[in-house]
Structure formats: C-alpha cells, structure tokens
Amino acid sequence: MARIGILKVRGAMPHYEELPFNIYVDESGMIRDLDALIIPPGTLVESKVLERYGWLGREVWDFVERGGTVVGVCSGVQFLSKSINLNVRGLPGYVEGLGVLNISLEPLIVTGPVLVKVINESWATRGLVNTELGGWQAHTYGKINVLNNDVQIDGVSTITRYNYRNATLETPTLVSSRKYRVFGTMVHGILGPNSPISKNLFNELGIHDERIIREYYKLSDERAWAPREDAPRIPRIITVASTMTGEGKTLLTSALVHCLSREGYYVGVAKLGGDIRDLHPSLYVLKRPFKPWMSIMLRWDDKALGWVGWREALSNAAGLGLDYLVVEGVMGLLTGSSRDSEDVFSSTIGFMKQVGTDVILIASAAYDGVEGAIFRLRSYIKELIEIGRKPIIAVLNNMYHGTHEDEEVVRFRRELEGLSILLMTIDALPISSKPEELIDLGDYEEAAVKISEESLCEHLIGSLGQS
C-alpha cells in the first residue's frame, strides 16, 4: 500500500479537514520512505517549525529533489514558499520559508467560503481546467506572489469579503511547481475522498480503486464529528463574552473546551460571525475538523457575517449529541447591539437574548488596569442580569498584583458572591500569540491547558453543577 504521510509537528492541524494520509510524520527519518507527503494547515511558519525541527527542512528538500510528491495546504503553502510577510499592521516583517515553491506571501485576510476556478493544468489539476471547486479560506497571510517561471498558477479564487470588508477580489490560490512534483492550495476542503484533485493525486500514485482510496481517510475519520448513539440531544450552551475586543475570549474558549473534553464530555465549539480563525486554537486542542455550522451568522444591515443561522448551528450540534457547545462571542458584548431586532441579531448580547445559554464574561486589566476591568465587569453583569443571562463566572484576565489592587479584587469577589457569581482571576501569561496574527497554536494550547488545569476546570464544573 502506498505510504502517504502527513506532517504532525507543533502548529500542524492534520485533522482540520478531510485529507488523505495513512502515516503521521513526527520524527526524523520517516519522510524518505514515503510515496507522498501532505503539509497540513495550521501555524507552521508562526510556530517556527523549520527552526524547532532541524531535520525537517533538509528531509523535505531531499524528498522533493528525489521526485517525491508533496501537497501543501494553506500553512503548508507558506511552509513551502520562499518568504512570508508576517506583519499585517506595520512595516514588512519577512521570514523565510523552505523555498521549494518560488513564491512569496503577503497579508490578505480571508475567512469564508470561496469558489476556486482551475485555469491551468498540472498533475494535480489534470482534466479540470475551467471547472470550479468549492471550499473555504481561513488565513491571514494569503496573497500569493509568483516570483519566477518555476511556479504555475493553477487556480484563482473569487473572494467577496477580505481584510474585514465586503469587496470582490480575484487572487491566485492554487499553485504548482514546474520543476518539482509539488502542489499548493490556499483553499481548504478540496482534498476529500470525492475531490477530483485527490483523484489526480491517487492516479499519480497508481491508486484507482475507490475502496482503497477510502482507506486513506480512515485516520482523518477517527477525529470526525460523529453522531453519538443517543443523538439527537440538546447540548448545553456556554457563551464566552467580553466587555471589549481583545480581552482573551479565544484563549478562554480554548481552555473551556480543553476542560470539558478532559472531563469526558462531547464538546463542540462555534464562533459568532465569520472570523473562523478564532476557532483554530480550540480545534487544535480538540484535534477535530472545522465545519460550516461552527460559524453562526450575524446580520449587519443587508449583509451576513458568518455561514449559517443560529437554529441550523444548534440543530447540527444537537444532531451530533454534543454535551456542550462553547460559543465565542464577537468583539465586545454590546458591539452591534444597536442593529439588533426581534427577528435578527448583530451582537453577542443579541444572540444571548435569542438562545438559552450560560454566560462566562471576561475583562482584561491590560487596557485600563484592574480598576477599569472591574468597573466594566460590574456594569456588564448588571446588563446581563437585566436580560436574564446572569454569568456563572466572571473572569479578570491579565491580573497584576499590588496591595490596593488585591484589596479591590477581594471586595469585588465578595460582591459577586452575593449574586452567586464566581470571580476567577488569570495572571498575565508570557504569551505573545494573537488569534488573528502571529499565532503559534502550540503556544496557545499550552496557555489554555495551564489556565484550565490550574483553576478554570475546577471552578467551571462546580458552577455548571449549581446553575
């Protein structure tokens, strides 16, 4: 049986989507014996895998130069590229990729479904010119620049929303090497068992039997979202909200799913709005794939931000028999609430009014100090109580300590105890990653596990039992 390996190192997400493989590559000496290698999505560049694993670059190059077949997906394309500009907000900050594909990547934020049109033929796109394939993109650094004739553009995506604005853009998303047997896609979801590109890959390996092809997805299937025997059942929903954007919702969500999963619960995760990058840390922790129902639609005037309506999302969660669905809010609790109506919602608080949900509210002391964070928590808790959504836990993130600050926290804790709300504090962690930029998923997982195991899990299970 042909050996198709998939890279499984820090920052790699081999289970993010259906991909064909039957071997995990996680140590030196494994690549040379493969027939094909998949470089999966994730945060391979941000996780500095070429530096962390000294053998990796050398062994991939040796494999490529011996005629090995390589497929890179999203972060895998960045890994194979010549350079990546990781600075999305200021001056260029280029880091080197492996250089197998003579391309560079620049910041381009895309987080939604796309159609990619095949425009040129390579071994991967043979027989597909002028056809369209449906998938999705979820990246921060996705603008491909071809640097010389060694690389061919095989496909172009038509994007209707990018860089947080609604506008149309056509951009290269499928590329192949004219020099090596290397193909890259920035589009997810086009390498499943029924994909014509996958069939071309299997043809290259001399595999034509559909039953054998299905065998290469067994490891992927092991982490699929499968319905439980007692499904459908209504999951308990926990919504993670913050007083402002950037206060730690994504990290807290990751810690929650780690805790609940560790306790033996079947737990899913979803995001209000369309920025599905915020789901990646939780999916990395769970080692499960992204699905469209995880992006819950908000209405913004006549535009939809997100993929599916909340009823469809919850129906999918119930159909799986999930015990818990953890939903990360969008920006601050009240952001967009002036657009809410009885029929549709544009905000986190609007979602809470529509859906029966437990609430965990977080505020960060990094912006205006412990005092400011407590003031915001107090104000927003009052607002939530008024709509019948009293938080089960309030989280003071990025806590720092001083005599007066600690006394203020003690007073606030007593105040919340009178409301049967638990106050949890999280000291500032040495983590530089951000969900939308420069995120090392391994770094995020370590921080989430630390929060979960040191304090959150014990408090969470107790609070859920009381509410």
Q: Model-predicted segments: where are they?
A:
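A glycine-centered loop/beta-turn motif at secondary-structure junctions
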Residues: 161-206
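Switch II (G3) loop of P-loop NTPases
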Residues: 322-340
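Ordered, amphipathic secondary-structure segments that act as subunit-interaction surfaces
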Residues: 69-76, 80, 328
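Glycine/small-residue-rich loop that forms an oxyanion/phosphate-binding "nest" at active or ligand-binding sites
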Residues: 75, 81-93, 336
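Active-site-proximal beta-strand elements of phosphoester/diester hydrolases
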Residues: 4-8, 134-139, 182-187
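Pocket-forming structural segment of enzyme catalytic cores
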Residues: 88-175
